[in-house]
Amino acid sequence: MDMALPIVNATAAVLARVSAAFNAPFARAVVFGVHIDGHLVVEGLLIAVIVFQLSRKSYKPPKKPLSEKEIDELCDEWEPEPLCPPIKDGARIDTPMLESAAAPHTTIDGKEVINFASANYLGLIGNEKIIDSCVGSLEKYGVGSCGPRGFYGTIDVHLDCEAKIAKFLGTPDSILYSYGISTIFSVIPAFCKKGDIIVADEGVHWAVQNGLHLSRSTVVYFKHNDMASLANTLEKLTRGNKRAEKIRRYIVVESIYQNSGQIAPLDEIVRLKEKYRFRVILEESHSFGVLGQSGRGLAEHYGVPIDKIDIITAGMGNALATDGGFCTGSVRVVDHQRLSSSGYVFSASLPPYLASAAVSAVSYLEGNPSVLADLRSNISFLHKELSGTPGLEISSHVLSPIVFLKLKKSTGSSNTDIDLLETIAERVLKEDSVFIVASKRSPLDRCKLPVGIRLFMSAGHTDSDISKVSSSLKRVSASVLSDYI
């Protein structure tokens, strides 16, 4: 409106001047008793111009259709763009196909191999009691739940599983999700919104990164597992910032980092959380059922009261030999997700037989705590056996079931590094029938930690399995990395 007013005024002034110019010659003109002035002349001219423009025929360029020969030439010359960009050699993934369950021993291409590439920490894949519970659930409920939890998808076994997990961890309530990685990237956006502040470890895995992105919050990263960096980041965000005191603030960390095998120092994180008045979201997919005297996770490992952690999430596929995930915490935290978490509201609920498997697995862990001792013994033995591996070094924590081997000397190129590591993994599988994997990352993954070889330890592995993978890695890495040692 402010810009249009001067234009209208200028137009009116021009018309007034033109009318005044015509008023003088026609000051005394009278036609059929009507006084003729400049306004009538100008308006008459405008009407004539409008009629002329409307009566003109629109311009149409002459039609010159293409001949059959020209059409054929154009078709021959046309080169369509590819539907997707070509895959570079470094991005190609030729994943071995398992032909049996992902137990400590599995089958690939008809040959039995030792499996260090699948997370089966408690060795429960193939457990007879868990299989029997699944069969009974299938006979009673069928395969699927046929709907989301809020729309005829809630089965009594879902409620039993939620109650079992909450009781096991000592929390007021818990909530089930139908897919492991969808748990964390649904929970984060359910609580964190645009304008909120999230401080996250730079080493979090892709599912956590996706949740951070979907939240649209302001995300600030601190150095991997560096509490001094976390303290400095929290200080900068809160010092003299009155606005920060009025908005929601979160710290997001993993208990055991999938990209490094390191364990987060929860006691120090809780101290900083209370000092700067942040909330903590803890992702426990690789520590639930593993850390702590009875497998209750990172809080039990550090002796931190579990109510000090605001939100805990975990996938159940790593320790419980099932699928799905859960979030646990206060009743208020859980109830909020039943209406606000996309992975819960808009996804079909966890198949009942998988919930039954989770209940049986937790019961097995409660009744057989010795399985944790077996797992820790295997991890310790593997660390000992892998010491002195040419060109590789262990960077993971001594209690982590993810034993992470990285290059002692990087080539300076992540693509070259991953090529070397994949060559090692391929030769170990081909020559010694030991299945291991390199930590290859998607182009969408923003984690910049060093790549490496991940060995997933299981309580079901034997000493001979561990000795074989160690000797194979030493022999093959000495050959592949001979120019880099």
Curated annotation (Swiss-Prot):
A GO biological process held by the record: ceramide biosynthetic process
Subunit organization: Heterodimer with LCB2. Component of the serine palmitoyltransferase (SPT) complex, composed of LCB1 and LCB2.
Domain of life: Eukaryota
Reaction(s) catalysed (UniProt annotation): L-serine + hexadecanoyl-CoA + H(+) = 3-oxosphinganine + CO2 + CoA
InterPro entries xref list: Aminotransferase_I/II_large, AON_synthase_class-II, PyrdxlP-dep_Trfase, PyrdxlP-dep_Trfase_major, PyrdxlP-dep_Trfase_small
Enzyme Commission code: 2.3.1.50
Transmembrane segment boundaries: 32-52
Membrane-topology descriptor: Single-pass membrane protein
GO molecular function, one term: pyridoxal phosphate binding
Enzyme class, UniProt record, top EC level: transferase
Recorded GO CC terms: endoplasmic reticulum; endoplasmic reticulum membrane
Protein name, entry field: Long chain base biosynthesis protein 1a
Species per Swiss-Prot/TrEMBL record: Oryza sativa subsp. japonica
Biological role stated in the UniProt entry: Serine palmitoyltransferase (SPT). The heterodimer formed with LCB2 constitutes the catalytic core.
Family (UniProt): Belongs to the class-II pyridoxal-phosphate-dependent aminotransferase family.
Subcellular locations according to the entry: Endoplasmic reticulum membrane
Pathway: Lipid metabolism; sphingolipid metabolism
Lineage of origin: Eukaryota, Viridiplantae, Streptophyta, Embryophyta, Tracheophyta
Keywords of this entry: Acyltransferase, Endoplasmic reticulum, Lipid metabolism, Membrane, Pyridoxal phosphate, Sphingolipid metabolism, Transferase, Transmembrane, Transmembrane helix
SUPFAM superfamilies, per the entry: PLP-dependent transferases (SSF53383)
Needed cofactors: pyridoxal 5'-phosphate
